[in-house]
Amino acid sequence: MPNPPASFEELIALPPSFKIVIEDPRSSTPGLGNVLWIQAAYGDRAPEIWAGLKPHVLTVTRGWSEAYGLFLDGEADMVLSYTTSPAYHAIAENDHRFAFAPFKEGHIAQIEVAGILKTSEKTDLAKRFLAYLTSVAGQKLIPTTNWMYPVVDLGADLPTDFGAQSKPEKLLSVDEAQITAQSRTWIDAALQALE
C-alpha cells in the first residue's frame, strides 16, 4: 500500500471498500491494546472513532494469529498487528513488502512482563532466570524470537532489518487506575459500536 492512512481519522475517511482486521479485546492483548489506544488518543471521542471504523472492519477475530492470517491471505488491506511485524518478514522470510503505518496521534505500547509467583518453590532459580532475561545476552534473543523491541539498548547487536523498521514517534499510555476502573466500559462501547 503506497499511502497508508496516518491516523484513525484518515482510515475512517477512506472508502468503505478499504478493510481492516482487528482482534477481540476480550480475548486478545492486541485487541485490548486497540481499545486503550483509541481511548488514549481520542478520549470522549472514542465512540465516534469506533463508529467510523465499523464500515472498514472486515471481522473481529479471537486472536492475533487469525487476524494476521486473514491479512496475509489478502482478505484485508490492513491488520492490527505489532510495529515489529515487518521486521519478522524482513529477517525470517527476506520479505520487505510489509511496513508499519505510523499514526499521527501516537501508538499504545504492548509491554510483556515476567515475574515470580509468591507460591514459587524455585525462587532462586526464577531470580537467576529473570536476571538473565533482562541482561544484554538474554535481550539479544528477544528481537528475533519474540519479535519485540528489547528492554535494553542492544546498539549494533540489534539486527539491521529490525533496527531499520519504523518505530512510533509518540507513545500513548493510559493510567493503570483508569484502566482498572474503565476498561470494561470502553470494551463494551467498542464492541457495541462494531455490531
Predicted feature locations:
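A bilobed periplasmic-binding-protein/Venus flytrap-type ligand-binding module shared by bacterial periplasmic
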Residues: 1, 39, 110-122, 141-144
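Substrate/cofactor-recognition hotspot
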Residues: 129
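C-terminal capping/gating helix-and-loop segments adjacent to ligand/active sites or protein-protein/ligand interfaces
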Residues: 139-195
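A ligand-binding cleft/hinge motif common to bilobed small-molecule-binding domains
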Residues: 72, 76-97, 146
